[in-house]
Amino acid sequence: MTFGDIQFLWARGIVETLLQAGVRCFVVSPGSRSTPLVLALATTRDIVVHKILDERSAGFFAVGYAKATGQTVCLVCTSGSAPAHYLPAIVEAAHSFTPLLVLSADRPPELHGNAAPQSVNQAHLFPSFSRLFVDLGIPESGDAALRAVTRKVTQAAVAARLPEPGPVHINVPFREPLEPSAIGITSPRPAVAAAPQFVAPRSALLDTETVKS
């Protein structure tokens, strides 16, 4: 198993855990560093994925979708300035008690503090507005590590709904290689523990096409 396979397995575990918690809508602004997350979404059933290239537009689309359906919506982006563009939507979600998750890819620790491109301190980007910040750390091999990360993701999904709905930020750093091997991408879905679900009727999911900017 390559390190790219390990990261892809983690990304799939994250997505599967969110799905178990009732998160079915993902709004993606793709970039290189978020490759494991985007591939995980592409290989997961029973979710709705919207691609919006501009993060500011994506943020407000997600807030509107969450308000219209009552569902938690998950924003997914790459590293650097990308998650910072969500700030106006985060403020809106915080003050309107709208359940919203931000799942940001990040550069690994060794690329921070030495002028590497698209490497900024993504910890606590929204300290005044997010209900919770969770950093998942560099992906590791092994069932115990995967169980630990799924527990943190479950905690984040719950925090977006309770005690009062609002935005939650999940940050996950990835190292290169970002792509899994041919064997890794066809590996079985990771088993994740059942999580508390906050699911509206499936009919509440908006029937909209992928949005592009």
Task: Annotate each predicted stretch with a short phrase.
Residues 1-213:
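N-terminal alpha/beta PP-like core and its mobile active-site loop of ThDP/TPP-dependent enzymes
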